[in-house]
Amino acid sequence: MGPQAAAGRMILLVVLMLSAKVGSGALTSTEDPEPPSVPVPTNVLIKSYNLNPVVCWEYQNMSQTPIFTVQVKVYSGSWTDSCTNISDHCCNIYEQIMYPDVSAWARVKAKVGQKESDYARSKEFLMCLKGKVGPPGLEIRRKKEEQLSVLVFHPEVVVNGESQGTMFGDGSTCYTFDYTVYVEHNRSGEILHTKHTVEKEECNETLCELNISVSTLDSRYCISVDGISSFWQVRTEKSKDVCIPPFHDDRKDSIWILVVAPLTVFTVVILVFAYWYTKKNSFKRKSIMLPKSLLSVVKSATLETKPESKYSLVTPHQPAVLESETVICEEPLSTVTAPDSPEAAEQEELSKETKALEAGGSTSAMTPDSPPTPTQRRSFSLLSSNQSGPCSLTAYHSRNGSDSGLVGSGSSISDLESLPNNNSETKMAEHDPPPVRKAPMASGYDKPHMLVDVLVDVGGKESLMGYRLTGEAQELS
């Protein structure tokens, strides 16, 4: 073979090498390209708030989600894993830092796909020196009239929502704070600021108590507090203002209650009584009033002490008409008399006397013990089936002792005149005149009534005076 053959072989070898490179480039272009290196996390910092340490970092945006691994190292110790394969940018390292007064470091690396970045390391962190502490708790109470009690609560160590204790007098908490109380007093538009220091003798493991004397509690007070660690020179955050309103004397309020409450009860009782009295009187005004004529009858019946005797009705079959007596049959509307006879004059006089007795309402002449008047009257009602209205039989004497004439009307007079005379009954009636009594004989309080005499012939031969309906009332009924 000559030199030409050797040169041809060399050219062929070069072509094969170039084609192999081109094929490998095309194959890798179809797959996802991996970055030549994974970026390192930046700004790795350890922070602590109320002794709760946390390490945080920053990382650039990637097409794939990166995951991180965190390691912690304390002074004179080794690196230990705290958080592995997390996607968050913060990790709590409370469990790895057992002593807050010892220096600690943290480092973080990222992993994207199958490649990992280098570790990014934080600066030295001393929790008791560089950590932050929140404000203490505060509460105000009125202890006396011119004294306020301020309660300051130590900051708490809270990890994952659970309290791990308070920051007071323990090496694991590294802080014992000296508290300063700030008082803002608004007095008549002028704002006064004062400071009060809380002594350690006034504190325990939970709180500190401070008593503040004030001149008066009739103005507004606002109080806040903060603390400082004299060894580490760490100051807490200042608390929010807690204000107490002006003081009001409760004794004055109690006196007002004691005065107003009885007055209110008394007023309510008066109103209820007035309402009840008004309702009672309104019912009385609606009650039915009796006529004067019925009131006289009720009064006479009430004042009567003698027991009532039975009524004996004289019928036309057993008449007791005397020679000197006249039967007056009253029609429903009027009584018919002869105008020219002397008996009419006496009858008119008798009716006047009867009206006078009725108008006066006197019952003295009707009692059994009163002496007989010059004019004696005895009456009875004649009830008959063939008569349309009641009749009254009236006997009267003239003033000179002789019997007067007779006045009659209708057929009832002729029936009575045909009856035989009974002289013995006449004499008995003249010597023993029966007393007159009123008795209610009416029906219906809303109808007019007329005076009616009824003879009572039981025992003492008494006469009873009653009432009957007038013709006008009978027509209405």
From Swiss-Prot:
Residues 276-477 are cytoplasmic. Phosphorylated at Ser/Thr residues. Phosphorylation of Tyr-445 is required for IFNG receptor signal transduction. Influenza virus infection leads to phosphorylation in a CSNK1A1-dependent manner. Ubiquitinated after phosphorylation in a CSNK1A1-dependent manner, leading to the lysosome-dependent degradation. Proteasomally degraded through 'Lys-48'-mediated ubiquitination. Ubiquitination is necessary for efficient IFNGR1 signaling. Its main location: membrane. GO terms for cellular component: plasma membrane. Residues 375-386 have a biased composition (Polar residues). Residues 335-386, 402-446 are annotated as: Disordered. It comes from the Eukaryota. It holds the Pfam family IFNGR1_D2. The keyword ATP-binding does not apply. GO terms for molecular function: cytokine binding; type II interferon receptor activity. The modification Phosphoserine is found at residues 362, 370, 379, 402. Receptor subunit for interferon gamma/INFG that plays crucial roles in antimicrobial, antiviral, and antitumor responses by activating effector immune cells and enhancing antigen presentation (, PubMed:20926559, PubMed:27286456). Associates with transmembrane accessory factor IFNGR2 to form a functional receptor. Upon ligand binding, the intracellular domain of IFNGR1 opens out to allow association of downstream signaling components JAK1 and JAK2. In turn, activated JAK1 phosphorylates IFNGR1 to form a docking site for STAT1. This is Interferon gamma receptor 1. The lineage of its organism: Eukaryota, Metazoa, Chordata, Craniata, Vertebrata. The gene is Ifngr1.
